[in-house]
């Protein structure tokens, strides 16, 4: 019988799906737990909600106790980590212990491991690697095409199933796609999926957006959820439907309403970022772009060159961090720097105009500021940034921003890049070629 997890998800007392990440290295912060995030997205795609994530260290007693607790409140548990050959790989043994089960050797798995290692030319220790061949007798094995640690699908008690995967992301993902997806669809899906479409905003805060769309935040299908990142806000629209086409039909009316309300602030969707959007627009306009950077030290250039195809529109950048280079490379007069300071509208404007001319570009963006933590004063505090954008037909836009002094150096630099790119986006949006 299928476990109709999603159908029951509106019941606060219902059972559901849990993710358990196993490994002391996760608790110590030695590695980032990307597996749980990836599996969460996969579960949503399959139409399943998971209600809890846990992380636990490599301790058999604690793992066993937690799994027993999970079995009383969930239908499906997905674990990652602890399937390797070392003494601290304890997942399978701990799971078996939770249900007083014994482990038996699967001889064919040992043959597979030896074959894989002989092909790769690796030496192997029989005593350590062989522990990966022991499973509960009625467990279904999940083959590992990329490594030596198989996983399993096991139903130790009625109404509770465990899927185990290694902690190596590349191995886990391939095993998931080859085995877990079909198994979950066949045994736990009610035929519905979750589909999400994310709108991305810049130049407006999360609280302002939330105030304006308070009624939309109460919707049940689709749901509307805001998320704030440094310099941008995301609105995730999620619908539950039989397929993606139906889900889009549910989402689209809400999306169009949001686009009408926030047309100036929405710069893209899903995988878009400000750099990719700007590159597409410049390609369409057949225009080029250069930078003259000071306080961002190349971060602005990096944001553009990280996008494939950027070389078709981005010519390069002059990183004039010192005053001497501002003078020698960008022809900023020494007396201008002495009179107004390197961090000033006048200097940023001169940097932009001269960079555009020297590098023969349609557009240029220049930035000079105080990223901190030192270097500021009462008149020019840490967080002060001047941006100048020069373009065709004598276009010139000057921008002054003062970011909070509570921001650290990297945050001020990243926010400065965001303001540069978003300001340029708005200029392109308002000008037609």
Curated annotation (Swiss-Prot):
InterPro entries: CinA, CinA-like_C, CinA_C, CinA_KH, Competence-induced_CinA, MoaB/Mog-like_dom_sf, MoaB/Mog_dom
Pfam family, one: MoCF_biosynth
SMART domains, per database record: MoCF_biosynth (SM00852)
Domain of life: Bacteria
NCBIfam families, per database record: cinA_nterm (TIGR00200), molyb_syn (TIGR00177), PncC_domain (TIGR00199), PRK00549.1 (NF001813)
Family recorded in the similarity comment: Belongs to the CinA family.
Protein name: CinA-like protein
The species this protein was found in: Prochlorococcus marinus subsp. pastoris (strain CCMP1986 / NIES-2087 / MED4)
């Amino acid at each position: 019988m299928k476990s109709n997890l999603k159908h029951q998800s509106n019941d606060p007392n219902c059972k559901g799906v849990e993710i358990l990440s196993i490994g002391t290295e996760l608790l110590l912060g030695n590695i980032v737990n990307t597996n749980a995030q990836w599996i969460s997205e996969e579960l949503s795609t399959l139409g399943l909600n998971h209600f809890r994530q846990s992380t636990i260290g490599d301790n058999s007693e604690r793992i066993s106790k937690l799994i027993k607790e999970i079995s009383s409140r969930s239908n499906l548990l997905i674990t990652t980590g602890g399937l390797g050959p070392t003494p601290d790989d304890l997942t399978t043994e701990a799971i078996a212990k939770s249900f007083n089960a014994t482990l038996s050797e699967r001889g064919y798995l040992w043959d597979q491991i030896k074959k894989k290692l002989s092909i790769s030319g690796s030496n192997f220790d029989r005593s350590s690697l062989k522990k990966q061949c022991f499973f509960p007798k009625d467990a279904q094995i999940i083959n590992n095409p990329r490594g030596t640690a198989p996983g399993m699908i096991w139903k130790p008690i009625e109404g509770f199933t465990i899927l185990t995967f290694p902690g190596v992301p590349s191995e886990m993902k391939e095993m998931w796609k080859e085995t877990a997806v079909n198994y979950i669809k066949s045994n736990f899906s009610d035929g519905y999926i979750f589909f999400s479409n994310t709108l991305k905003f810049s130049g407006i805060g999360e609280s302002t957006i939330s105030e304006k769309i308070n009624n939309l935040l109460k919707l049940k299908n689709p749901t509307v959820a805001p998320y704030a990142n440094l310099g941008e806000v995301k609105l995730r629209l999620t619908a539950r439907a039989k397929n993606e086409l139906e889900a889009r039909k549910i989402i689209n009316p809400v999306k169009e309403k949001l686009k009408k309300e926030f047309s100036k602030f929405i710069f893209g969707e899903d995988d878009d970022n400000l750099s990719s959007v700007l590159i597409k627009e410049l390609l369409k306009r057949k225009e080029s772009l250069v930078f003259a950077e000071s306080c961002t030290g190349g971060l602005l250039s990096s944001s553009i060159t990280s996008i494939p195809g950027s070389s078709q529109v981005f010519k390069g950048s002059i990183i004039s961090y010192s005053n001497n280079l501002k003078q020698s490379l960008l022809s900023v007069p020494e007396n201008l720097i002495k009179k107004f300071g390197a961090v000033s509208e006048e200097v940023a404007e001169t940097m932009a105009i001269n960079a555009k001319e020297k590098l023969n570009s349609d557009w240029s963006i220049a930035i000079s500021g105080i990223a901190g933590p030192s270097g500021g004063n009462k008149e020019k505090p840490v967080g002060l940034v001047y941006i100048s954008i020069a373009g065709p037909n004598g276009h010139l836009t000057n921008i002054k921003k003062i970011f909070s002094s509570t921001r650290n150096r990297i945050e001020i630099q990243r926010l400065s890049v965001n303001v540069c790119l978003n300001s340029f986006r708005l200029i392109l949006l308002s000008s037609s070629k």
